């Protein structure tokens, strides 16, 4: 393949999806500026967007101002848009969607995924260009991918190219301006230039299909970005079609996927399964009181070894197995408590 042919593939992929990428502008009414923290345009906003809440002069009382921006992409011609939850996290904000042709629409947040950095936004429009959704389970390390989005909140529909650098990564990222941390497991790692502003935009393959949603970076690191696998979003879209909301099963515990390293470090009986344990957050609990897990009698330091008779493999998160189940399903768990094996069962609830 000569250089012309090599360049043609990403060029054609970008042409195919470019019309379906949107910018999302975040605006808020500022009732007072007393005590407010204002970020000059030349300094990055530590809350995650490099957009200043004022242009040269502070806002006056009651004025609506732009406080941030992100990206998204159209998945249905009637105005259904995928983006990141952290882009549209603020329930007090107003969201304006700017399509590739420069038209502006009021954006209504239809749903926010309770366990992933995914949100669905709706605009009132017809016959919009749509980006096809690929299959994120068929990705391979080294595969070429392309990110498109509202780079740094300033440069609309910027394009960058790279590869899939890793699969099934686990990260913790700040969600919104309140500093709440969200733990994302099973995300894609890429060396594509992902930054504040192009979060929520599509990560596409050379066929012009979205295989991920750009979501996070590691500040201070070069060429390390992360994306949500598109198959997670497909399930959310199916839920919205069926129920009008995103529905996720809830067991009610925190757990650590086990491997040989953790087995040796903590002198555990097994190198696979899910260790029920609280995390580092203040007031964290391993088992949520009153939850299905609590009613089943699961306790901190239990090791869950099997789910519905299926052994939990090494380095496998329990959440990945729960994704196969639905609200209202009975779940049978085998647990190891000290040296005693126990079998329990409970009914999954809807995560709120």
What are these regions (language model features)?
Residues 1-265, 271-272, 350-352:
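Serine-dependent protease modules
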Residues 11-12, 85, 235-352:
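C-terminal recognition in membrane/secretory proteostasis and scaffolding
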């Amino acid at each position: 393949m000569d250089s012309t042919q090599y360049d043609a593939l990403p060029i054609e992929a970008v042409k195919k999806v470019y019309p379906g990428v949107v910018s999302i502008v975040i605006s808020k009414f500022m009732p007072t500026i007393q005590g407010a923290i204002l970020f000059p345009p030349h300094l990055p906003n530590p809350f995650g967007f490099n957009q200043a809440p004022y242009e040269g002069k502070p806002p006056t009382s009651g004025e609506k101002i732009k406080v941030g921006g992100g990206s998204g992409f159209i998945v249905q011609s009637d105005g259904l848009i995928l983006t990141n939850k952290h882009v549209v996290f603020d329930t007090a904000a107003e969201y304006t969607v700017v399509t590739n042709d420069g038209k502006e629409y009021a954006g209504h947040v239809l749903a926010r995924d309770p366990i992933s950095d995914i949100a669905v936004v709706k605009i009132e429009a017809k016959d919009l260009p749509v980006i096809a959704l690929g299959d994120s389970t068929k990705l391979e390390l080294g595969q070429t991918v392309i990110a498109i989005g509202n780079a740094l909140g300033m440069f609309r529909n910027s394009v960058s190219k790279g590869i899939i650098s890793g699969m099934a990564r686990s990260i913790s990222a700040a969600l919104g301006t309140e500093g709440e941390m969200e733990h994302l497991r099973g995300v894609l790692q890429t060396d594509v230039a992902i930054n504040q502003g192009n979060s929520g935009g599509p990560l596409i393959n050379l066929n012009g299909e979205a295989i991920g949603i750009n979501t996070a970076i590691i500040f201070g690191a070069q060429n390390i970005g992360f994306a949500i696998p598109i198959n997670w979003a497909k399930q959310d879209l199916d839920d919205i079609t069926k129920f009008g909301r995103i529905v996720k099963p809830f067991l009610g515990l925190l757990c650590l996927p086990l491997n040989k390293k953790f087995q040796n470090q903590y002198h555990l009986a097994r190198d696979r399964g899910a260790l029920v344990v609280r995390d580092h957050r203040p007031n964290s609990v391993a088992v949520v009181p009153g939850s299905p897990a609590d009613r089943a009698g699961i306790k901190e330091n239990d090791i869950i070894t099997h789910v519905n008779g299926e052994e939990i493999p090494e380095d496998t998160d329990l959440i990945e197995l729960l994704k196969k189940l639905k609200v209202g399903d009975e779940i049978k768990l085998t647990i190891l408590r000290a040296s005693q094996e126990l079998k329990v069962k409970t009914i999954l609830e809807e995560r709120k």
